[in-house]
Amino acid sequence: MSDPRKAQEQEPTTHFGFQDVPESQKAEKVAEVFHSVAAKYDLMNDVLSGGLHRLWKRFTIELSGVRPGNRVLDIAGGTGDLTRKFASIVGPTGEVVLADINDSMLKVGRDRLLDKGVAGNVQFVQADAEKLPFPDNHFDVVTIAFGLRNVTHKEDALRSMLRVLKPGGRLLVLEFSKPGNPLLAKVYDTYSFSFMPLAGKLITNDADSYRYLAESIRMHPDQETLKAMMVDAGFERVTYHNMTGGIVALHRGIKP
């Protein structure tokens, strides 16, 4: 008879913030975080970034090159900031799919967009970035904003994104990264591990989720490492743009 404790010991581990957890548990733990913060996610984004997240997303939209009639996949689309803008660009002949693995975030995004009259050319799909349930060569543009760091197997997710893109299609990864200036990095560390959990406690009554978010940012690959991962996954002409001193980076890659 097999010993379940030995099986757990042999299971590969991954990071959940600064903790090492069995790979099979990470998705569930991340889900708990976003179930907790979904209702006030937009408010917290504004508070924690001072509204800068709107500028970062605007630049993502500009660099995406989305045009009328395009088909766009917004992975980890959450409350629908990018989806709403993309839907207005692609128009009635195009399509935007807002995909999120977390049903609480997906519901908030769907309700928010429907309240704003965004309908007709938008679909909402609960989906795992590592195993996207879409046909090969299907989308003109795929985006993932502030979601890749929460994925357990990032390499698998990047390959899955490549698969669903049309040849010549573009992937854009907007994510927290590593500041290049040591002084800025020190200030950012203090802000992340002091102010973020405090704000989480005061606004959502959940300091732990925002402590995890700060830790997950530190564990995410830096700019050059993520660029190399995208190249290894099969993307070409991979570039990145640092924003706010490298606190955030936007990577773009093209499917051959």
From Swiss-Prot:
Biological process per Gene Ontology, one example term: methylation
The chemistry this enzyme catalyses reads: a 2-demethylmenaquinol + S-adenosyl-L-methionine = a menaquinol + S-adenosyl-L-homocysteine + H(+); a 2-methoxy-6-(all-trans-polyprenyl)benzene-1,4-diol + S-adenosyl-L-methionine = a 5-methoxy-2-methyl-3-(all-trans-polyprenyl)benzene-1,4-diol + S-adenosyl-L-homocysteine + H(+)
The kind of enzyme this is, by top-level EC class, is transferase
Keywords attached to this Swiss-Prot or TrEMBL record, sorted alphabetically, are: Menaquinone biosynthesis, Methyltransferase, S-adenosyl-L-methionine, Transferase, Ubiquinone biosynthesis
Q: Which InterPro entries match?
A: SAM-dependent_MTases_sf, UbiE/COQ5_MeTrFase, UbiE/COQ5_MeTrFase_CS
| CDD domains per record | AdoMet_MTases
Q: Which family does it belong to?
A: Belongs to the class I-like SAM-binding methyltransferase superfamily. MenG/UbiE family.
**In its UniProt entry, what is this protein called?**
Ubiquinone/menaquinone biosynthesis C-methyltransferase UbiE
Q: Which organism is it from?
A: Ectopseudomonas mendocina (strain ymp)
